[in-house]
């Protein structure tokens, strides 16, 4: 199986909230460097995606602003693809895992009705991400998997 984070997206992100998510993600990217160097980074009006730099890479994390269509990969992994989109990212707890957790925390904080998350990890695994998000983004997030 492996160490994996999961999320469900129920709708597209509000434009202003997405812009805030991208801005926070850019700040977080700077904060995790150099311990977590990122590769193949896209933080745009349409998508946030990244991986670790080889050999500290695993699966690419991808979050789309718009609701992905039902025919996307993983669409068959849930009962009703018209209701939500399921995705996951196996990080093997490599250094970029911290950034994956941070983006999921911020996304859920900004749009809790749009995205929910779950994890194979324990609360203690997520505490560094919670602390970093709260410090860098001036938010008050907590570990609250709700998927």
Residue ranges and their predicted role:
Residues 1-147:
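Acidic (Asp/Glu-rich) sequence patches and key acidic residues
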């Amino acid at each position: 199986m492996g160490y994996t984070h999961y999320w469900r997206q129920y709708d597209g992100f509000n434009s202003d909230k997405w812009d805030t998510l991208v801005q926070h993600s850019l700040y977080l990217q700077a904060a995790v460097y150099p311990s977590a160097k990122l590769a193949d980074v896209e933080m745009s009006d349409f998508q946030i995606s990244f991986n670790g730099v080889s050999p500290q890479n695993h699966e690419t994390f991808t979050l789309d602003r718009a609701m992905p269509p039902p025919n996307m990969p993983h669409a068959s992994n849930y009962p009703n693809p018209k209701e939500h989109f399921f995705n996951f990212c196996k990080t093997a707890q490599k250094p970029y895992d911290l950034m994956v957790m941070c983006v999921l925390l911020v996304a859920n904080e900004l749009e809790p009705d749009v995205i929910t998350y779950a994890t194979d990890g324990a609360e203690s695994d997520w505490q560094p991400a919670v602390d970093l998000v709260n410090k860098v983004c001036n938010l008050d997030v907590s570990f609250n998997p709700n998927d």
